[in-house]
């Protein structure tokens, strides 16, 4: 559920490839009691392991974007 929220946010903002956003903006999609929790960190780690999300360090902060090479897999995952 948390992974789908993260992906839905990035899809709605059209954050693919070179376009990226700060990780804290992605965590704002979650209710306040889940922000920064172990579950949200594990969900983010799982998305990175599946290569759905690309992590980038920019301006000293972690930035994320969707992997454009995994577009079909991301849309299939969202349909499940």
Question: Which residues are covered by each model-predicted region?
Answer:
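Short, amphipathic alpha-helical interaction segments positioned at domain boundaries
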Residues: 69-80
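Minor-groove-contacting beta-hairpin "wing" of winged helix-turn-helix DNA-binding domains
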Residues: 60-67
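Charged interaction/catalytic cores of defense and host-pathogen modules
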Residues: 42-44, 55, 64
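Short acidic, hydrophobic short linear motifs in intrinsically disordered regions
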Residues: 16-30
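A short, conserved structural fragment
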Residues: 48-58
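Short alpha-helical segments that sit at the start of domains
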Residues: 1-18, 78-80
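Short amphipathic alpha-helical interaction segments
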Residues: 33-49
């Amino acid at each position: 559920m948390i992974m789908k929220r993260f992906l839905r946010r990035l899809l709605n903002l059209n954050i693919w490839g070179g376009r990226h956003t700060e990780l804290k903006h992605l965590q704002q999609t979650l209710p306040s009691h889940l922000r920064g929790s172990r579950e949200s960190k594990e969900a983010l780690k799982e998305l990175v392991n599946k290569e759905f999300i690309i992590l980038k360090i920019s301006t000293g902060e972690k930035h994320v974007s969707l992997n454009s090479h995994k577009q079909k897999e991301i849309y299939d995952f969202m349909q499940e």
